[in-house]
From Swiss-Prot:
UniProt GO cellular component terms: astrocyte projection; axon; cell body; chromatin; cytoplasm; cytoskeleton; cytosol; endoplasmic reticulum
Transit sequence range: 1-77
Subcellular location: Mitochondrion outer membrane; Mitochondrion inner membrane; Cytoplasm, Cytosol
Enzyme Commission code(s) on record: 2.7.11.1
Biological classification of the source: Eukaryota, Metazoa, Chordata, Craniata, Vertebrata
Positions bearing Phosphoserine: 227, 401
Catalyses which reaction(s): L-seryl-[protein] + ATP = O-phospho-L-seryl-[protein] + ADP + H(+); L-threonyl-[protein] + ATP = O-phospho-L-threonyl-[protein] + ADP + H(+)
Gene Ontology MF: a single term: magnesium ion binding
Annotated region described as Required for outer membrane localization, given as residue ranges: 111-117
Protein name (Swiss-Prot/TrEMBL): Serine/threonine-protein kinase PINK1, mitochondrial
Length: 580
């Protein structure tokens, strides 16, 4: 049927071309020049006069990349045939000329059929994407109903330390529902003493299943920013990149925070990226374990040799059970589960790239983990203190001086970053740097040692390693996943797949086996599969109160659906499977 339609369309185009360019009787105003009533060589109908400033109307959606070059080539061929035909046209159009134009029209008919198919596929993808984009924007905020609360340290009951890093300490915390609970805790001196406080329901009873400390408060160590709120916000502004709009509505001492055009970007919410619910400056308290764990970071009035200032920045986030490193020390996920965990990191990195942000400090310590009702881990990227989120430069950082910071994690620094040399016009491209780090972390997720950590002969350095030195992954790992991890760790960034294409590869390998099994992968078959996946995902999301990890991943896939990126992922998978 498609061939018949293309032939019919080709005949119509061929007939139209013959009628358009065939010689017409009438006055001639010069050798080889048509009269005023003719319109040879202008692509117009005879007798139609166009205004000098008229512009051709665009024909709907732009032609996909894979057809554009061929269409332009055909257009050039048409121009040559037209010129030759006009020269010979005075003697009449012979059978040969008619055959050439008929063949040319048939070729255009086939191209137009492919173009129409691509337009239908692109339109279907856009409609599916619009549905699931709205659903993925619904990131829960436990403080959403407390519009003007939580902007002071005194609003929280702080428990024990969760952990500490290079620039901050993190504590568990809760906010009593009723004001009298807070007043009672303050009266008893429980603030900062690790009280045994649980969340309460609206009636004052403990909410079933509610954690005792649902929040984590990150207290930044302030050594060089001074004690003014302006200086603190300027120095630590990168920490505010994943903050919600409501998080920045509080008063920072005597200062109300305002985002400047030259400041860092504000990251849109994503299920695989941490969300900061509240941010504020306050005096540094003496929290549990401070004198033992980080005495040098305290102000001198707590520790005489302390280097810290008396005021700093506090960030309120969700309290996650553990980090990825802690989870992998206790658990060994199955190959399918590990593939889904790697996929979650790629989804998060793709969102950062689309927002023009580079994390630059991806490691298993900066990835948090929680579980769904089935015990499947859900990963969240955290700690944006080293991120690149500059509106002026995007992901292309000018590297005109060696004093420009490359990022925070030297071991997992992509080759194009670690080997960059400063100069007047030097630029570091971070568009695929975090994707490379995901490839390295994938070794840990699949139960192997990270090849870029440690010492000895097995240790690799991103500056000098060769791809042949990368250790083989276990045979239990699916072949396409092994191939993808190696492709993510290619030294040349332009040879690596983007985070979006890499995520699509894993999506297809997990849930698109039926589609990949087809001998001839056509767009109409792909669209039918996507519609089926959309219906099944919507149904699964409705049937469960809380979506499981697989459903959430499928929703992310459909929310980021792009026809071209999906086709590239399918072709990449097919080429890997066809290779010996």
């Amino acid at each position: 049927m498609a061939v018949r339609q293309a032939l019919g369309r080709g005949l119509q185009l061929g007939r139209a071309l013959l009628l358009r360019f065939a010689p017409k009787p009438g006055p001639v105003s010069g050798w080889g020049k048509p009269g005023p009533g003719a319109a040879w060589g202008r692509g117009e109908r005879p007798g139609r006069v166009s205004s000098p400033g008229a512009q051709p109307r665009p024909l709907g959606l732009p032609l996909p990349d894979r057809y554009r070059f061929f269409r332009q080539s055909v257009a050039g061929l048409a121009a040559r045939i037209q010129r030759q035909f006009v020269v010979r046209a005075r003697g009449g159009a012979g059978p040969c000329g008619r055959a050439v134009f008929l063949a040319f029209g048939l070729g255009l008919g086939l191209i137009e059929e492919k173009q129409a198919e691509s337009r239908r596929a692109a339109s279907a993808c856009q409609e599916i994407q619009a549905i699931f984009t709205q659903k993925n924007k619904q990131v829960s905020d436990p403080l959403d109903t407390r519009r003007w609360q939580g902007f002071r340290l005194e609003d929280y009951l702080i428990g024990q330390a969760i952990g500490k890093g290079c620039n901050a300490a993190v504590y568990e915390a809760t906010m009593p529902t009723l004001p009298q609970h807070l007043e009672k805790a303050k009266h008893l001196g429980l603030l900062g003493k690790g009280p045994d406080v649980v969340s309460k329901g609206a009636d004052g009873e403990q909410a079933p299943g509610a954690p005792a400390f649902p929040f984590a408060i990150k207290m930044m160590w302030n050594i060089s920013a001074g004690s003014s709120s302006e200086a603190i916000l300027s120095k630590m502004s990168q920490e505010l990149v994943p903050a919600s709009r409501m998080a920045l509505d509080g008063e920072y001492g005597a200062v109300t925070y305002r985002r400047s055009r030259d400041g860092p970007k504000q990251l849109a919410p994503h299920p695989n990226i941490i969300r900061v619910f509240r941010a504020f400056t306050s005096s540094v308290p003496l929290l549990p374990g401070a004198l033992a764990d980080y005495p040098d970071m305290l102000p001198p009035h707590y520790y005489p040799e302390g280097l810290g200032h008396g005021r700093t920045l506090f960030l309120v986030m969700k309290n996650y059970p553990c980090t990825l490193r802690q989870y992998l020390e206790e658990q060994t996920p199955s190959s399918r589960l590990a593939t889904m965990m790697t996929l979650q990191l790629l989804e998060g990195v793709d969102h950062l790239v689309q927002q023009g942000i580079a994390h630059r400090d991806l490691k298993s310590d900066n990835i948090l983990v929680e579980w769904d009702s089935d015990g499947c881990p859900w990963l969240v990227i955290s700690d944006f203190g080293c991120c690149l989120a500059d509106e002026r430069v995007g992901l292309q950082l000018p590297f005109n001086s060696s004093s420009v910071e490359r990022g925070g994690n030297g071991s997992l620094m992509a080759p194009e970053v670690s080997t960059a040399h400063s100069g007047p016009h030097a630029v570091i491209d971070y568009s695929k740097a975090d994707t490379w780090a995901v490839g390295a972390i994938a070794y840990e997720i699949f139960g192997l040692a990270n090849p870029f950590y440690g010492q000895g002969s097995a240790h690799l350095e991103s500056r000098s390693y060769q791809e042949a030195q990368l250790p083989e992954m276990p045979k239990s790992v699916p072949p396409e996943t092994r191939q993808l991890v190696r492709s993510l760790l290619q030294r040349e960034a332009n040879k690596r797949p983007s985070a979006r294409i890499a995520a699509n590869v894993l999506h297809l390998s997990l849930w698109g086996e039926h589609l990949l099994a087809l001998k001839n992968l056509k767009l109409d078959k792909m669209i039918a599969w996507l519609l089926q996946q959309s219906a099944a995902t919507l149904l699964a999301d409705r049937l469960r109160e809380k979506s499981c990890v697989e459903t959430k991943l499928q929703m992310l896939f459909l929310a980021n659906l792009e026809c071209e990126a999906l086709c590239q992922a399918a072709l990449l998978l097919s080429s890997w499977r066809a290779a010996p």
